[in-house]
Design a protein with these regions (language model features):
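Sec-dependent signal peptide recognition
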Residues: 2-9
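Elongated periplasmic alpha-helical coiled-coil
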Residues: 10-14
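Secreted/periplasmic proteins
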Residues: 6, 17-106
Length: 106
């Protein structure tokens, strides 16, 4: 196998299984210290996210305007996007009172 083929194969294996752009929203502070769908307790300023179908415990890389953060899925949401904890949104510079387009890969 030539070096070029080897590098191509290596790049394909290193690529994330799924990558897409979605709308991110931020959890309301009302949920702080309440049970989440995956068996934990939601911490508003912690690093976590909710998604409608990505399995609980999956670590998702979220990217926004050049910033990137690995966030565990700890809850479910009734949306076609991702809900970020305030702590995750703050680190990614997602507006705490709005929505933003983000990239996710897992």
């Amino acid at each position: 196998m030539g070096m070029r083929r080897f590098l191509l194969l290596l790049a394909m294996l290193a690529a994330p299984a799924q990558a897409r752009t979605v709308t991110a929203t931020v959890y309301d502070g009302w949920y702080h210290n309440r049970a989440d769908a995956c068996g934990g307790t939601y911490q508003h300023w912690g690093i976590s996210a909710a998604h409608p179908w990505i399995p609980c415990g999956t670590r998702v890389r979220v990217t926004h305007q050049g910033r990137s953060l690995v966030v565990p899925i700890t809850d479910r949401c009734d949306c076609n996007s991702i809900d970020l904890s305030a702590g995750a949104a703050y680190r990614l510079r997602v507006p705490l009172d709005g929505v933003a387009k983000v990239g996710i890969s897992y």
